[in-house]
C-alpha cells in the first residue's frame, strides 16, 4: 500500500515517545501513520443478517476481513473501487451497511460489553451517525437513543444517516453537551461520549490533521472534555455505564480526563477493564483498564476508549436557565389511532408497542415510548419518525417511515429489477413489463424497501425524495 506524507510537529513526536508503552515500536508507529487507512464497513443488522449480507455480495468479489471487536464489521477491499464508489452501491443506498472506520466501532462494543442491555441511551456527540446507528442496531430498534449534536450543520447529516438505516427509536437534540447533567439528571442507563478532540489518530485519513496542533490546544480541549464528561456522568443513572472515547493519542485528552473524574467523584466512579473486550485487546490495555489504541497495533486509526460505571447518586447540578416551551404534539389514541394503524398496515407499514402515535396538526408521528419521560425537560430538534400527513383522501406516507417500518413480504410489495432500481434512485418513474395489481405499491429491491409509490396505469410514479436523488454512476455502472 502506498505511503503518504504526514505532517508531524516535533513537539507531537516528543509527546508520542513519552506516551507510547515500551512494548511498542516508535518506528512502527511512524510507518503505520504513513500508510493510508484500510476501508471498513459495518453491516446494518436492523435490515439484514451478517450471513445474508455475505451471501448477497458474494458475486461481487469483495474481499472482507472480520474486525475482531465488531461481529458485523469488516475491512473491505474491492477491485472496482474507482469504477463504483462504495457509497453508490445498491446495498449502501438501501441502508444495508454503513461506511465506518474500524476503530470507531470500539466505543459501542464497549458500551454493550458484558451483556449490557440499556433501554435509554444518550450519544452526546452523535454526528455523522456511525455510532448512533450502531447503538440502534445493538438495541434492535427498541428502547430509545437521545442523539445530540452541537454543530447545527451536522444535525442534518445525522438525520439523513439515521433515516437511511431505518432507525425508529431516536430523538435528535442540538445542544452543547454540557447542559445535559443539569437538564436530564440521572436519566440514562448508558451514555457514549465520543468527545471532540485534537484528532491525532486520524492522520492516516488526513495527512494534514496536525497542521494546527499544539500542546496548548491539547490542554484547552482537555478542559472542555472534562466539562462534557462531568455533564455526562451527572446524566447517567446510578448503576449505569458510560463510555468515553476519542480519536486522539495524547494522555491529557484521554487517561488524564478519566482520572480527573475518578479524583473528583472517588467511589462513585468505577473503571471497568476492557482487556477481555475482544481477542488481543490486552495489546492496547492501559494499567487503568482503558484501551489506548496506537495505529500500528491493529492497523487502524488511533483511538482511546474507557468504560466506567456510576456506583452512586450525585448531588444535582444547578437547574438550567433555559425554557423548553410548549410541546407541540398530542398523543393519538382510541379510534383515531386505530384508523391510522389500520391504514398503515394496509400498505405494509408495521410497528410494535415500542412506538406510540402522536399528532401535530395534519402530521402523524411515531415516538419511542422510552423518550416520553423526557418530554418537557429538553427541546428536541426531531423526535421519532414522521409517519404520514393526513389529507382529504387519506394519508401521505413518509419516506423515512417506509424505510424503517415497511414489511418487504407484504402483499403490495413489488420487487424491481436491477435496472429499475437504478432508475428509482435517479428519481425516474418505473415502467415494468408486468405492472403491479395494487394502486399503492411498496417498491423493493434485494427484498429491501425503497419507498411507497402509486401505480398510474402501467407506470409506477417515483416518490423518492428529491434531496436523495442520485446522479453519476450507480450500481449497474451506467451514468
Curated annotation (Swiss-Prot):
Keyword set, alphabetical order: Cytoplasm, Methyltransferase, RNA-binding, rRNA processing, S-adenosyl-L-methionine, Transferase
Biological role stated in the UniProt entry: Specifically methylates the cytosine at position 1407 (m5C1407) of 16S rRNA.
Q: Which InterPro entries match?
A: Methyltr_RsmF_N, MeTrfase_RsmB-F_NOP2_cat, MeTrfase_RsmB-F_NOP2_dom, Nol1_Nop2_Fmu_2, Nop2p, RCMT, rRNA_ssu_MeTfrase_F, RsmB/NOL1/NOP2-like_CS
Q: Where in the cell is it found?
A: Cytoplasm
Q: Name the active site residues.
A: 247
Give yes or no: UniProt keyword Glycoprotein. Answer: no
Tell me the GO BP annotations in alphabetical order. Answer: rRNA base methylation
Say which family it is in.
Answer: Belongs to the class I-like SAM-binding methyltransferase superfamily. RsmB/NOP family.
User: One GO CC term of this entry?
Assistant: cytoplasm
Know the name of this protein? Ribosomal RNA small subunit methyltransferase F
Q: Is Flavoprotein a UniProt keyword of this protein?
A: no
Q: Main site of residence? A: cytoplasm
Q: Which reaction does it catalyse?
A: cytidine(1407) in 16S rRNA + S-adenosyl-L-methionine = 5-methylcytidine(1407) in 16S rRNA + S-adenosyl-L-homocysteine + H(+)
Q: What is its EC number?
A: 2.1.1.178
Q: What class of enzyme is it?
A: transferase
Q: Quote one Gene Ontology molecular function term.
A: rRNA (cytosine-C5-)-methyltransferase activity
Q: Which residues of this UniProt protein bind S-adenosyl-L-methionine?
A: 125-131, 149, 176, 194
**Source domain of life:** Bacteria
What high-level taxonomic lineage is stated for the organism? Bacteria, Pseudomonadati, Pseudomonadota, Gammaproteobacteria, Enterobacterales
